[in-house]
Design a protein with these regions (language model features):
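Short helices/loops that flank or line small-molecule/ion binding pockets
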Residues: 75-81, 205-213
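Extracytoplasmic substrate-binding proteins
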Residues: 26, 84, 95-172, 193-197, ...
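Short secondary-structure boundary segments
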Residues: 31, 89-90, 112, 166, ...
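A short, structured surface patch at a secondary-structure boundary
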Residues: 26-80, 84-96, 230, 239
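N-terminal export signals
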Residues: 6-22
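His/Asp/Glu-enriched short active-site or ligand-binding loop at hydrolase and phosphoryl-transfer sites
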Residues: 176-201, 221
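C-terminal segment of N-terminal export signals and the immediately downstream linker at the start
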Residues: 1, 18-30
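A ligand-binding cleft/hinge motif common to bilobed small-molecule-binding domains
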Residues: 93-102, 216-234
Length: 288
């Protein structure tokens, strides 16, 4: 019930931000998925600055960067003269956000969306906040339909055990436990988290990875590049003895697409589902 109330409040906040016909003209977006959503809704030309996590699309990556989303400076944001700041809930520090609001700039905070329902609520909320409510509703509906079509194509039963690695190669690999975006995507794709007993992201010993016995290992393209490629990752202690390593079942995805629960949610889910269920007949996805 509390989660549902939070989602309803989120939508109400964005809906009440601007009077009809007064869409913002200078927007600062803080958070990769938020930025991507604004661009997907056709308002990229109004974005004047972003944070370091906003790497897609290319036009967003070319805009002025305001630092890391949790370590912002109010002066940098205000120097861009925004009339709206769209930010994830973890944007901060709180003093910087308060200073931006005190300067008369509207700030909309958007909760992290680790699941389909909150992701669609966030897309609609972004659309309402930037004066594109109809476009936001249409995009959310399209993504919801695409995810439903993917789910319909998944084979029943036999969920593969999936280990998601957020980092590897420097110390013990960091794996995704429960309550993470990675676990939510694994579940949507018809898989089972191999380390579901963990909470959030935790370092795993070699023994723990062997005990997890994943059928598939999933990571990000940045992590795979950082460790030196597929062969090196699969040869890491603990990983090398897993069923996934033995079968060579390793897949890497763009981090924002896979974990951001933004406009590319269905596209990323489609790719993950194909990895987990090679024989499944899945629909063709639109690229965003």
């Amino acid at each position: 019930m509390m989660r549902r109330r939070g989602l309803m409040a989120l939508g109400a906040l964005a809906l009440g931000l601007h009077p009809a016909g007064a869409a913002p003209r200078r927007i600062v977006t803080l958070g990769g998925a938020v930025t991507e959503t604004v661009f997907a809704l056709g308002a990229g030309a109004e974005v004047v600055g972003t944070d370091l996590t906003s790497r897609f699309p290319e036009a967003a990556a070319a805009l002025p960067r305001l630092g890391y989303v949790r370590q912002l400076g109010a002066e940098g944001v205000l120097s861009l003269r925004p009339d709206l700041v769209l930010a994830t809930a973890d944007a901060g520090p709180p003093a910087a956000i308060a200073q931006i609001e005190a300067a008369g700039v509207a700030v909309v905070r958007l909760e992290e969306a680790h699941g389909l329902a909150p992701a669609l609520v966030r897309i609609r909320a972004v659309g309402a906040a930037i004066g594109r409510a109809e476009a936001g509703a249409a995009l959310a509906a399209a993504i919801g339909a695409e995810v439903a079509a993917i789910a319909a194509g998944l084979p029943p039963g036999g969920a593969p055990r999936v280990l998601f690695l957020l980092s590897a190669g420097r110390g013990a690999p960091m794996a995704a436990g429960s309550g993470t975006a990675a676990e939510a995507m694994i579940s949507l794709a018809g898989g089972r988290n191999a380390v579901e007993g963990l909470r959030q992201y935790r370092a795993l010993s070699a023994e723990a990875m062997l005990a997890a016995a994943p059928d598939v290992i999933v990571t990000t393209t940045d992590t795979l590049e950082g460790v030196g490629g597929r062969r090196r990752l699969l040869a890491l202690a603990g990983i090398d003895g897993t069923p996934a390593a033995g079968a060579g079942r390793l897949a890497a995805f763009d981090a924002l697409a896979l974990l951001g629960f933004g406009p590319r949610l269905a596209e990323a889910l489609h790719g993950l589902a194909r990895v987990l269920h090679p024989g499944a007949v899945l629909p063709v996805m639109a690229r965003r």
